[in-house]
A protein has these predicted regions:
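Class I S-adenosyl-L-methionine-dependent methyltransferase catalytic core
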Residues: 1-281
Length: 281
């Protein structure tokens, strides 16, 4: 089992709920994921997971649009078996055999082995490629060979730090966007200062690149503080940035984000305020 412990938490709910619906809308032939981690995880019922997937499943049960979501359908079935599906498994289940190619990057070999095993189980091995490599370099090198119909899922946590390739993950999104590809980027932050810095970095970088058509939304715990950490459920806020996607996908990103704020309005993380607020980029 891989060493990854960040799964089934509240930011994963945002990321994975939206990923599933956007993939269903966009139906790409090629799916690339920069930081795959595992396809499937055994649940451990930590406080962070209680605040994440368990809270979502309980509350979504009462909200028809969330209960009808692909994410709810896939995770509720797997959670009954004691497992959580990560983004590689969700993407493979949503796209299935209609996708010609899945490309997964990660630095954890055991995580990629997990992805490969899961692909075999659902009979998609023939279309799955795994790359044990730095994905900022690997993805940048891959982009010129991909058709514009490709979908790039960028999920590194830190989007403003340059890797060995000399580029950041926001640079990867910008390059792919300028080539006409559909992109979904997720990022996280733990303080208000982090959030403000990232917001400025994202908007100024997109403006410099001439990218005006994008959808950005952030969900942040009301427990966040300017430059300190009051509580730590993994991270205190996260954002989704989408480019070159359809209007239907843009609408879903905003709609589901607002619905998550609604179902978290009385939430608690341990004894802390677990409610969220939304901000658009």
């Amino acid at each position: 089992m891989a060493t990854y412990t960040h799964f089934a938490k509240q930011p994963d709910v945002l990321k994975h709920l939206i990923l599933c619906e956007v993939l269903k809308n966009e139906t790409p032939q090629i799916y690339v994921e920069t930081n795959s981690a595992c396809a499937i995880y055994p649940m451990t019922q930590t406080p962070e997971q209680q605040y994440g997937i368990y809270h979502f499943l309980e509350k979504a049960d009462e909200v028809p649009s969330l209960k009808d979501s692909i994410y709810y359908q896939l995770e509720s079935g797997e959670m009954a078996k004691g497992n959580y599906l990560g983004s590689p498994a969700l993407a493979m289940n949503v796209l299935g055999k209609q996708a010609k190619r899945f490309v997964f990057f990660d630095l954890e070999k055991s995580a990629l082995e997990n992805v490969g095993t899961y692909a075999k189980q659902i009979e998609l091995s023939a279309s799955v490629e795994i790359h044990h490599a730095d994905s900022s370099r690997g993805t940048i090198e891959l982009l010129p060979s991909l058709p514009t119909s490709s979908f790039i899922h960028i999920d590194p946590y830190e989007i403003d730090k340059k890797g060995d390739s000399g580029v950041t993950y926001l640079d990867v999104l910008i390059q792919a966007t300028l080539l006409g590809m559909k992109c979904l980027l997720w990022y996280g932050f733990i303080t208000g200062d982090d959030k403000a810095s990232l917001d400025n970095y994202i908007t100024s970088s997109l403006e410099k690149a001439g990218i005006k058509d994008y959808t950005g939304v952030e969900l942040t715990m009301n427990s966040i503080r300017k430059d300190s950490v009051l509580c730590n459920p993994g991270i205190l806020g996260s954002g989704i940035l989408a480019t070159n996607v359809s209007q239907a996908s843009k609408d879903i990103i905003l709609d589901y984000s607002n619905q998550l704020v609604d179902i978290y309005k009385d939430a608690k993380y341990k004894d802390y305020d677990g409610s969220l607020y939304i901000q658009h980029l």
